[in-house]
Amino acid sequence: MRLLLGLLGVCGLLMVPCPVGVAQADAGDCPPYCDRIPSSAWIAAPSIPLYDVYRWPDPAAVAMPTSAPRWQFEEQCAVPAGREDPRDYAVAGRAVVTQPAGEWQLQIQVLHWRGETWRTGETAMTVLRGATDAIRRCQHTAPGSSPTITTDLGTGVAAVLSVAGERVLREYLLADPRNGTVVELAMWASSPPRVPWSARSDVEVLAALAVPLCTAYIDSCL
């Protein structure tokens, strides 16, 4: 519990004030530039699981704008498309690192909704709750899949989804209602992967996704 409070307190998701000056603001932060994902919004490469093995590139350097983004687990779980999906009108960016077969693949997405935070924050939380529910239902929508939610903090969720003998997926999703943003970090490999899974705790990974948002979306975490 102390670890949870300490890590998520840094980014204020447990209503603990975030210290001013955690990182220096960049000229491209939001505001004023809110029609794209700021470079400062992305998780630092060394904080991505298995960095010591793969030496991941800076996500901001490989990210591209994307439209109507969907989570990595949705195809595996055969999640049916909804009639109205808030992700269709989000400002979004995606960073993908493709590896040879048997290695861990990487996808990171940042979705942001512009507007008054009381409204966009609720949108972000609605999207996260929908994703969490879809993961829980995965074994029903895709009977060959086996989902396990390893951490559910309300504002962040981590899960392992596997298809026996075929694929394993590690999914992290983090919502920050103070700036109307949701971040996904997904890593997957054919089973068994060449490199055994190794990562910091779920809470630490989720915190690493959350902290940059306080810099990218100016004054959102005060």
Name the predicted role of every residue range:
Residues 89-122:
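A short acidic-to-branched-hydrophobic micro-motif
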Residues 1-25:
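Secretory targeting and sorting signals
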Residues 24, 28, 70-71, 132, ...:
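Processing junctions and N-termini across compartments
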Residues 57, 62, 68, 72, ...:
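Short Gly/Thr-rich strand-loop-strand
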Residues 142-222:
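A short, solvent-exposed beta-edge/loop patch
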Residues 120-127, 131, 202-205:
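Stable alpha-helical elements in mature extracytoplasmic
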Residues 24-95, 222:
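N-terminal "mature-domain start" segment
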